[in-house]
Design a protein with these regions (language model features):
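N-terminal Rossmann-like dinucleotide-binding module
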Residues: 1-55, 333
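C-terminal helix-rich "cap/oligomerization" subdomain common to oxidoreductases
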Residues: 1-6, 75-77, 224, 297-335
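Active-site loop of classical SDR/Rossmann-like NAD(P)-dependent oxidoreductases
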Residues: 43, 282-296, 312
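Hydrophobic residues in well-ordered beta-strands that form the structural core
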Residues: 61, 101, 126-128, 157, ...
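Rossmann-fold dehydrogenase core element
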Residues: 114-131, 151-156
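Predominantly a Rossmann-like dinucleotide-binding segment in NAD(P)-dependent oxidoreductases
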Residues: 132-205, 210
Length: 335
């Protein structure tokens, strides 16, 4: 390719996370040369137009199908409720669009596999947007783990506790609610980031609400060589000190609150920081400016012809969702 043309984005969903993604993407130093928010789609034309006006998108659609049919759009960000993730991902892939879909892609590995296999068949990029993996400090964490500076790593701990069970989409079974898919997935991805393999054994416990969706969980992942990960997450407690630690025989890495979207990380001999700038539209979630990194990563993958991310690729989706499947089985979580 002679030059890197602008990547035209279609945005499905005009809610909080889509706002944060668009606002964060616009903070990229090369935004105007590499990215363009071309179209917004929502469940109503009015809502789509209001969102489009905020981000100066030239097109607003009251139907997601219109995004699929728009020939100007090369990539689609899916930021709707996750009960729609598989359907819309398949729709956009069928239309020949690359896809960045908010997590969780689906409640089961088999449903995730259906989407990934179709993306491979269509020779298109598909990213499940576990945004943690695209933060520069997560690269630094992986490099430090692989360097040997920590010695033999034998323990990983994470905690993610915030009072969110009053949120409608999380407390209802028909909306595939629960905290495992919402915040527990961040704890799981962190352990997988460190160890890079499936655990040999999983021990999980959690409590379900009256509708049968999970409100909290404690999970132990047991790996070969007596290595372990201890994961704690809850949607019904007061906010905790939501940190993560990697412990080795020679040293440790500490990631302060919020470990899934950290502003900084304390390595064995230095502290590294991310740039998390404010965007043109106020953010709704912690450190949402970091969403800029997944947008930038998608651009680089597409323009270099890579269809599987080295930071969070198909093997990572498989590993994490197979662990989710086993945890769901053990705690009695069924959709």
């Amino acid at each position: 390719m002679a030059e890197e043309k602008v990547l035209n984005w279609g945005i499905c969903g005009a809610g909080k996370i889509s706002n944060d993604f668009c606002s964060a993407m616009m903070t990229l130093s090369r935004y105007e040369r590499e990215h363009k928010i071309t179209a917004i789609a929502a469940r109503s034309q009015e809502k789509a137009q209001k969102f489009a006006d905020i981000f100066e998108a030239p097109k607003a659609y009251g139907s997601y199908k219109d995004v699929a049919n728009d020939p100007d759009i090369e990539i689609v960000y899916i930021g709707v409720i996750h009960t729609e993730h598989v359907r819309l991902s398949m729709m956009m892939l069928e239309a020949g669009k690359h896809v960045v879909c908010e997590k969780p892609l689906a409640p089961t590995w088999q449903e995730c596999k259906k989407v990934l296999d179709y993306a491979k068949e269509k020779k298109l990029l598909f990213l499940e947007a576990v945004w943690s993996r695209f933060f520069p400090v997560y690269d630094a964490i992986k490099d430090e783990v692989n360097s040997g500076n920590l010695g033999d790593i034998s323990m990983v701990t994470t905690q993610f506790c915030i009072p969110i069970m009053s949120v409608e989409r999380l407390c209802r079974k028909d909306l595939m609610g629960g905290v495992l898919l919402d915040i527990g997935i961040y704890c799981i991805q962190f352990a997988c980031h460190v160890y890079g393999e499936m655990p040999e054994k999983i021990i999980a416990t959690g409590s379900l609400n009256e509708e049968g969706v999970d409100e909290d969980g404690c999970v132990i992942l047991l790996y070969s060589g007596n290595r372990k990960a201890s994961l704690v997450y809850s949607g019904k407690t007061a906010s905790g000190n939501n940190t993560a630690t990697i412990m080795g025989s020679k040293g440790q890495i500490f990631i302060d609150d919020c470990f899934w979207c950290p502003k900084s990380v304390k390595l064995t001999d230095t502290t590294l920081e991310n740039k998390i700038p404010e965007g043109p539209s106020p953010y709704n979630f912690y450190n949402s400016g970091g969403l800029r990194y997944e947008a930038d990563h998608a651009f680089k993958l597409i323009r270099s012809g890579q269809l599987d991310s080295p930071k969070y690729g198909y093997k990572d989706v498989e590993m994490i969702h197979k662990i989710i499947d086993e945890i769901s089985k053990q705690i009695g979580l069924k959709y």
